[in-house]
Curated annotation (Swiss-Prot):
This is Protein SEY1 homolog 1. Its EC number is 3.6.5.-. GO terms for cellular component: endoplasmic reticulum; endoplasmic reticulum membrane. Its main location: endoplasmic reticulum. Keywords: Coiled coil, Endoplasmic reticulum, GTP-binding, Hydrolase, Membrane, Nucleotide-binding, Transmembrane, Transmembrane helix.
């Protein structure tokens, strides 16, 4: 059961004195029910001290409209107020303390400690002291409460930071015009100054003027039964204490921010009384800081609870995907928490307020940083997925379009950095640049792998293109072998490969390939391209014999204007001359092909390596040749090695000789066609029995069998033209030697 009666409360009662503690629950209930909790920090506390039974409670009731118990004049004089009562001005934010009177006869000897404790409690709470003194007691030490004032002065120096003035108002009761106000004021100020000079002071206050720390006023009141005048004077005093519009308002420069909020006052006063009641050193700033710590901690937790739903919602969303404007949403939550915190905490001790504000921010920032880590991973995954999608699309693009496309792809890095910048609350706070660097490295590695894969595919295509171009270049020369065969191949190949080289170089640079790797790519390109040229030449060498034979036929069989030659009208000497000229020409071409090697030279131009062929004259195989591709000289370096050269020359010679024999036969056909046909039948009639006899003769039969076996063997080993050449030689000999003898004998028989 709380003990408040109306709007008053017994703050320090017998239980508080005996148990040395306050009932904070009852005090809290009073603070709520009386409306004190609503005034926050905007208040002043006025307490009254004085001797017992001097009308202190009555004066307070007149001044502030309170309802403190007053002494019934018809009863015996005694103690009315025990300890400290607390109440509030009915209209203004002035809290009033009615302190137990001093010199109480009810207090036993040695119990003046209670008076000191209540005075100290009043001092800890009050901004202004009203010292109630009767005019006829001005010269009395105890009546003027000088001992209590001494305690107040001493403790005031210890308890308070001296940036505000403590107000002391002497209210001199039962004043009459016959008294000298100036004399009374001088006397009271003299008492205070003497006390100030007597009390020990800290070093910083030794030279301090008393009036810098205390504001002293002397107010006189007539006898209370002079109601009108007494009421007017009490109203004037009340205005000084409660009316902020009064020019004489004593709390004009008061810093209300230093007050303890009434919502925290029960705990604050409980802590103070425990210290005072146990005669311990009281430290009011520490007590205020303690209360501020406790309340700001509680308010901080309330602020965290107030944004709990918002933080959990943000956490749930960031778990599934990255959140747009993550940083702004974090700031919004911080703002809500700050608003909740400021609403109740901003009036507490400034340092504590800032400390707990920082703790609130740090706790939220720690949560946000955890979310930020997940946000960052989601952003990385999102943009890496977009990169993969873009690269999959680029696989279908021409590789020469990739440099421009890669510039477009690079925008993903910019977008990632922008999204990440929107995910932070303060630039650099969460080391977002480290995440940007890691993402860029991961991004570039995937891009590099893609480029390498595309280059590998392109290199295969480029090899095929080079092979095709080399085949065109070589084939063009093979179709018309000439002394410029090698020089033209060299020039055409160099022109083609230079163009491809420069484009390949530009492509590699556009694809962000590193300089050293570009050199490696280009060197490999040069070597592979030259190897392709060698392969094409090697394959084309199989066509050399046929092409040379065709070029021989073109010169031997046809005239310069392309018309077929008439061998019947051409003499054998002319045929032989044409044959010799055409044969020597193609053999000279064959020798050109034989005595050349294909060599690779790398020429350094403007820090670039350019592939070029070099057609070197044949060097005897015993002499070692140094190559920039290979240090070895093998048969592959020679276009026509000795074995292949001999084989081609033999086959070419055979085919050429066949053409020559055909021409001779066509020339001789005119002579045989002049023999009458009946003569051939007559010759066969007279010689058939001789033919049969020859067939039965082994000397004739065995040579025929040997000749047939020779023909079969030549066909089996691929020298099918050799029997033909042998028979042509035999028949040519017969035509030139035997037939003239035969037909000459026949002519003689006809003559005889």
């Amino acid at each position: 059961m709380i003990k408040n009666q109306g709007d008053r409360y017994h703050l320090i009662d017998k239980n508080a004195l005996e148990e040395k503690k306050l009932d904070s629950n009852e005090l809290t209930e009073f603070v709520k029910s009386s409306g004190l909790i609503d005034i926050g920090k905007k208040y002043n506390i006025v307490s009254i001290i004085g001797s017992q039974s001097t009308g202190k409670s009555t004066l307070l009731n007149y001044l502030f409209g309170t309802q403190f118990d007053v002494q019934n004049r018809q009863q015996s004089v005694g103690q009315t107020t025990v300890g400290i009562w607390i109440s509030k001005d009915v209209k203004n934010n002035v809290v009033v303390l009615d302190v137990e009177g001093s010199d109480s006869v009810e207090r036993k000897s040695g119990e003046n400690m209670v008076e000191n404790q209540t005075a100290l409690m009043a001092l800890a709470m009050s901004h202004c002291f009203i010292i109630n003194v009767f005019v006829n007691a001005l010269g009395q030490h105890t009546s003027c409460q000088l001992s209590i004032i001494k305690i107040i002065m001493q403790q005031n120096l210890k308890l308070f930071q001296q940036d505000t003035v403590k107000h002391i108002i002497f209210v001199v009761r039962d004043w009459d015009e016959e008294y000298n106000y100036d004399e009374a004021s001088r006397k009271l100020n003299g008492y205070l100054l003497n006390i100030w000079n007597e009390i020990p002071k800290p070093d910083q206050y030794r030279e301090t003027d008393f009036h810098e720390l205390f504001s002293v006023q002397v107010v006189t009141l007539v006898y209370y039964k002079l109601k009108n005048e007494f009421a007017e004077q009490t109203n004037q005093l009340h205005s000084k204490l409660a009316n902020q519009q009064d020019p004489n308002f004593i709390f004009k420069d008061f810093d209300y921010e230093k007050n303890v909020r009434w919502s925290d006052m029960p705990q604050y006063l409980s802590n103070i009384w425990v210290v005072i009641a146990n005669n311990k050193d009281l430290n009011l700033p520490n007590e205020k800081i303690l209360i501020s710590n406790m309340r700001c901690q509680q308010i901080k937790l309330e602020a965290l609870e107030g944004v709990k739903d918002l933080t959990e919602d943000l956490q749930n969303r960031v778990r599934t995907q990255f959140v747009e404007n993550f940083g702004q949403q974090c700031l919004s939550i911080l703002g809500v928490a700050q608003k909740i915190y400021d609403k109740d905490a901003k009036d507490y001790h400034a340092d504590v307020y800032k400390e707990k504000e920082k703790e609130l921010r740090d706790e939220l920032m720690n949560k946000f940083y955890t979310y930020f880590q997940r946000q960052t991973e989601s952003l990385k995954q999102h943009y890496m997925n977009r990169l993969s999608e873009n690269l999959e699309t680029l696989k279908r693009e021409s590789i020469y379009d990739l440099p421009d496309k890669l510039n477009e792809v690079d925008l993903l890095k910019v977008n990632f950095e922008e999204s990440l910048s929107k995910s932070v609350i303060e630039k650099g706070l969460w080391q977002e640049q480290d995440h940007v660097g890691f993402f860029n490295q991961q991004f570039d590695n995937q891009l590099k792998s893609f480029v390498e894969a595309q280059l590998a595919s392109f290199k295969q295509q480029l090899d095929n293109i080079i092979k095709s171009e080399c085949d065109k270049i070589v084939s063009q020369q093979v179709l018309n072998i000439s002394p410029k065969f090698w020089s033209q191949i060299d020039a055409d190949y160099y022109t083609m490969i230079s163009d491809k080289y420069s484009k390949y170089d530009a492509l590699l640079s556009g694809l962000r390939v590193q300089w050293k790797q570009i050199d490696d790519y280009l060197s490999k390109f040069e070597e592979d391209s030259f190897h392709n040229l060698k392969q094409v030449i090697a394959v084309a060498s199989g066509r050399f014999k046929d092409q040379l034979f065709q070029q021989f036929k073109a010169q031997f069989v046809r005239t310069e204007d392309g018309q077929p030659r008439n061998w019947q009208k051409t003499t054998e000497e002319e045929i032989f001359h044409i044959y010799t000229e055409a044969r020597d020409k193609v053999f000279s071409f064959l020798d050109i092909l034989r005595i050349r090697k294909v060599k690779f030279i790398r020429i350094q131009q403007t820090m670039k390596k350019i592939a070029k062929t070099h057609l070197a004259p044949f060097t005897p195989l015993k002499e070692k040749i140094s190559y920039q591709i290979s240090a070895d000289t093998d048969s592959d370096d020679v276009v026509l090695n000795e074995v292949f050269y001999t084989q081609v020359k033999m086959q070419l010679a055979e085919d050429i000789d066949v053409q020559y024999q055909d021409a001779i036969q066509k020339h001789k056909q005119d002579f045989l066609q002049n023999i009458p046909k009946p003569f051939w039948f007559l010759l066969l009639f007279f010689m058939y029995d001789d033919v049969l006899r020859w067939m039965g003769n082994p000397l004739f039969l065995y040579p025929i069998l040997i000749i047939l076996c020779f023909i079969g063997f030549c066909i089996a080993i691929g020298l099918h033209s050799l029997p033909k050449l042998a028979f042509q030689t035999v028949f040519r000999t017969i035509n030139q030697a035997l037939l003239p003898l035969i037909f000459g004998g026949i002519s003689k028989l006809k003559t005889s």
